[in-house]
Amino acid sequence: MGQKVKSADAAVIGKVPSVEHARMTRPVRPNLGAGALTSYGFAIQAAIGRRPMRYLVGRRFIDHSAVTALFVLQPQILAGSHVWITEDSARRECDVETHIPTMRNSVRLVERYLFDCLPLTDIGYLDLMAWRYPGLGATPEDVEVDMSWSRWPAAEPRCYLGPVTTPGLTVTEAVDHETGMVVARAVERLRQPLRRWEVVEMGGPEVGGLPERVRASRVRNGGWTDFRRVGEPVPVPQEAFDAGPARLRETLERGLSGKAA
């Protein structure tokens, strides 16, 4: 059965807002936050069949801005690739750049590609962002959504229309009431599922719930890919992010030595 998603503006003017309305309008915590750490890195591993995949992730928060970097260590065909995401939640800005070793320069992704995945993986660009992509609708839509596939039945689904560059696209995010975190996400076009992502195992309070394990799926391909965090996040000097991708990767490799080798 689908769940009815209520708009954040659905409370009747002049009445005391309901508990459900208060939940709907409550701010959502940043994705992949690590508690008190504001500049940090962690390692991830996964596998598609017998092909291992290993990544390093760096994240820095400064006020209302965030920088997120993902570096591919394996598979070998993608080794040396990276994704660089810069966000400013106050200005509602988000830029995503990708680089693979065969490129002379990094490429800034146009908006319609931001709802897809890194090449040869199930890692979605949306899943790496600190906040909901600003090009989505400002408030949830009053529509039926199907989140029956998710292991978070009590989480509150919020469905947002995609930008004009992606007609018919919607993104539904399910928010856990206890933590305020997005724990499941579905991307659909014309009501047909394209991608799904969800938290499988939440991290402890000492790391702000940074997931221990998530899974993702390109629905048309069938099956799920499990991504596991290897060890705890480590502090990273903020200036390492200003030095550019190559220097940041070196810093992450030193700090996470042995966790994603």
Each model region followed by its residue ranges:
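Short, low-complexity, Pro/Ser/Thr/Gly-rich segments in the mature regions of secreted, periplasmic
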Residues: 246-260
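Gly/Pro-enriched, hydrophobic low-complexity segments
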Residues: 71-75, 86, 95-99, 105-110, ...
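N-terminal mature ectodomain segment of secretory-pathway/periplasmic proteins
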Residues: 9, 15-102
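Catalytic cores of nucleic-acid ligases and guanylyltransferases
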Residues: 2-7, 101-103, 107
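Short, low-complexity, intrinsically disordered N-terminal peptides in bacterial proteins
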Residues: 1-16, 261
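Positively charged, low-complexity intrinsically disordered regions
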Residues: 4, 55, 60-61, 214-219
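Eukaryote-specific, intrinsically disordered low-complexity regulatory segments in nuclear proteins
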Residues: 135-137
